Swiss-Prot record:
Cysteines joined through disulfide linkages: none
Protein species of origin: Polaromonas naphthalenivorans (strain CJ2)
Name recorded for this polypeptide: Aspartate/glutamate leucyltransferase
GO cellular component term of the entry, any: cytoplasm
Xref: SUPFAM superfamilies: Acyl-CoA N-acyltransferases (Nat) (SSF55729)
Protein's cellular compartments: Cytoplasm
Predominant place of localization: cytoplasm
Catalytic activity: N-terminal L-glutamyl-[protein] + L-leucyl-tRNA(Leu) = N-terminal L-leucyl-L-glutamyl-[protein] + tRNA(Leu) + H(+); N-terminal L-aspartyl-[protein] + L-leucyl-tRNA(Leu) = N-terminal L-leucyl-L-aspartyl-[protein] + tRNA(Leu) + H(+)
Function: Functions in the N-end rule pathway of protein degradation where it conjugates Leu from its aminoacyl-tRNA to the N-termini of proteins containing an N-terminal aspartate or glutamate.
């Protein structure tokens, strides 16, 4: 892990939180390293922080800082070398007719209702399935960086936009796109999540940005392990981005 003294952002301060229950690995305690003050973390600073393994949740910019555990590994996909596998190509082809709109962060009841359906289906009992409007807004719709809310809608026979199928929140950084959060209609075998990542990779390519940052890969968490399937990819290890295929074994203890 990069030490505080090595961070180039001298105007910011960094502190460690108290331990709290890990959201990904049952029975574990987690801690975060938090960057403050939030009003100084605009797009340039945040882009630099992301390359150091930070993420954001609303105005909260953090990275894992756990005692004796390195299970959360930052992962990014180099756009120029990405090669989709067979299932990813199927997901891309299947959803080509979705109508896509990129919006500023905004609250719409339709979005919130989709969020609740997604949480109740995919993460029931995790707490987020009962998020209030205020919690949803603080989590996804507050940002000081270059953020976008992307709608994916069914295309009706007349070419007009129909039912809302998916929402992706993303940040456009200096060197890439950072995938913040995606939620979608909980349809079996639809592959919306894979399509969202593929769409962001293509969007980064069109914008001339070299990377898509997918957050943390956690080998022991099935909900997070899928990220390794977007290959080739790079992970942040000992302060350096390296190809995951050549990385040394990572300790999860």
């Amino acid at each position: 892990m990069t030490h505080l003294k090595d961070l180039p952002l001298h105007t910011l301060q960094f502190y460690a939180t108290a331990p709290y229950p890990c959201s990904y690995l049952p029975g574990r305690q987690a801690r975060s390293q938090v960057a403050t003050p939030s009003h100084l973390i605009h797009n340039n600073a945040y882009s630099e922080l992301v390359t150091q393994g930070f993420r954001r949740s609303g105005m909260f910019t953090y990275r894992p800082y756990c005692d004796g555990c390195q299970a959360c590994v930052p992962l990014r996909v180099p756009v120029s070398t990405f090669q989709p596998d067979r299932s990813q190509r199927r997901a891309w082809k299947r959803h080509q007719k979705l109508l896509v709109s990129s919006l500023k962060l905004c609250f719409l009841p339709e979005h919130y209702q989709l969020y609740l359906r997604y949480q109740n289906s995919r993460h029931a009992g995790g707490g987020m399935d009962h998020d209030s409007i205020d919690q949803y807004t603080q989590f996804l719709l507050q940002s000081r960086v270059n953020s976008r809310l992307v709608e994916f809608r069914e295309c009706l026979p007349n070419g007009e936009a129909g039912a809302l199928k998916m929402i992706s929140i993303l940040d456009v950084l200096e060197d890439g796109i950072s995938a913040v959060y995606t939620f979608y209609e909980p349809e079996d075998q639809a592959g919306y999540g894979n399509y969202s990542v593929l769409w962001q990779i293509e969007q980064a390519r069109q914008l001339g940005l070299p990377f898509v940052y997918l957050g943390y890969w956690i080998a022991q968490s099935p909900k997070m392990n899928y990220k390794l399937g977007f290959r080739p990819n790079e992970i942040l290890q000992n302060g350096q981005w390296i190809a995951s295929s050549t990385a040394k074994a990572i300790s999860h203890e």
